[in-house]
UniProtKB/Swiss-Prot annotation:
It catalyses: alpha-D-galactose + ATP = alpha-D-galactose 1-phosphate + ADP + H(+). This is Galactokinase. The lineage of its organism: Bacteria, Bacillati, Actinomycetota, Actinomycetes, Mycobacteriales. Substrate binds at E16, H17, T18, D19, Y205. It is an enzyme of class 2 (transferase). Keywords: ATP-binding, Carbohydrate metabolism, Cytoplasm, Galactose metabolism, Kinase, Magnesium, Metal-binding, Nucleotide-binding, Transferase.
Length: 363
């Protein structure tokens, strides 16, 4: 039996690098999706093909970390995690199509892993609840691919719903729906892809996580969430000033997430926009994960009339989001494109987007 299963990319409205610190985040699922079509066969491997790559990749069912590399490592990691948890995985043929841009900060990796998990589960009749699937997906990304990411991307892909943002508490692993329908208030969410690509596997992302872990250790706690209620004064006990800045971002970002959710409840998109901009400033000044190109896009959007703008995703490239009055959307988009090109960068791809359904079997 051939099955098809789709999983979306995501935009994190606010709450960056908070998930592995057991804080808060507020993502939405995107209309852009990765679809995996899987036909089980009596073989000892899965042959995977992607519309983003030439040729095919062979994934042995008994694969181990490091055996499969490149784009296919994410699919292999999903297979490895399923089998490690005792779930059945048959051999077969797997076809992957996607309109989630790789390296754009929209979590193409989580979309791929989620779609593979869903397709194999649907083909075998295996029922795995969404939280467990998110944990399997994180295990695939952390332990097979080697990217030290948290649960945010996977929870967003699995729990996403139309006109809904997801307030995630990573300490308790709870997901609370929050109405997100800016169009009803004549506001649009612009997605501005800088075309500067980034990678999570290794590098700066891992350094930021290690910095946060050192800060927590200096404070005598297991995670920075444990000092959230103490306020910024608690950070004086952190030995390294850079680690202290990283921790300050996490604590202030957690509060911005809660304030943003409250603003949505009041349909106050002016306040929500201001929080986006404050988040971007914190990522630039305290967490040091933006770039000159990303800063230019965010700042140009605000100057042109956006209510607020911020980078979304792990950093060092990717995309910027902005809340924009509907009647200013074209001017903001044109201004951002022109500013980037004038500065010598590729023209950003600017589009409207919205909260869409989460992962599901395709008809």
């Amino acid at each position: 039996m051939t099955v098809s299963y789709g999983a979306p990319g995501r935009v994190n409205l606010i709450g960056e690098h908070t998930d592995y610190n057991l804080g808060f985040a507020l993502p939405i699922a995107l209309p852009r999706r990765t679809v995996v079509t899987f036909t089980p066969e009596h073989t000892g491997a899965i042959t995977a093909r992607s519309d983003r790559a030439d040729g095919s990749a062979r994934i042995p069912l008994d694969t181990t970390p490091g055996q499969v590399t490149g784009w296919a490592a994410y699919a292999a990691g999903a297979i490895w995690a399923l089998r490690g948890a005792g779930h059945p995985v048959p051999g077969g043929a797997m076809s992957i199509t996607s309109d989630v841009e790789i390296g754009s900060g929209l979590s193409s990796s989580a979309a791929l892993i989620g779609a593979v998990l869903g397709a194999v589960g649907a083909a075998t009749g295996t029922r795995i609840d969404r939280l467990e699937r998110a944990r399997l997906a994180q295990r695939a990304e952390n332990d097979y691919v080697g990217a030290p990411t948290g649960l945010l991307d996977h929870l967003a892909a699995l729990f996403g719903a139309p006109k809904t943002a997801l307030l995630i508490d990573f300490r308790d692993i709870t997901v609370r729906p929050v109405a997100f329908d800016p169009d009803a208030c004549d506001v649009v969410l612009l997605l501005m892809d800088s075309r500067a690509r980034h990678r999570h596997a290794g590098g700066e992302y891992a350094l930021r996580r290690a910095s946060c872990e050192r800060a927590a250790a200096d404070l005598g706690v297991s995670s920075l969430r444990a000092v959230q209620d103490r306020g910024l004064a608690a950070l004086g006990a952190i030995a390294d000033p850079i680690d202290a800045r990283r921790a300050r971002h996490v604590l202030t970002e957690n509060q911005r997430v809660l304030d943003f959710a409250a603003a949505l409840a009041d349909s106050d998109f002016t306040a929500a926009g201001q929080l986006l901009t404050a988040s971007h400033e914190s990522m630039r000044e305290d967490f040091a994960i933006t770039t000159e190109r990303i800063d230019l896009i965010a700042e140009s959007a605000v100057r042109a009339g956006a209510l607020g703008a911020r980078m979304t995703g792990g950093g060092f490239g990717g995309a910027v989001i902005a809340l924009v009055p509907a009647d200013r959307a074209r001017d903001v988009a044109d201004t951002v494109r022109r500013a980037a090109v004038t500065a010598g960068y590729d023209e950003p791809a600017v589009s409207r987007t919205y909260a869409a359904p989460g992962a599901a079997e395709c008809c």
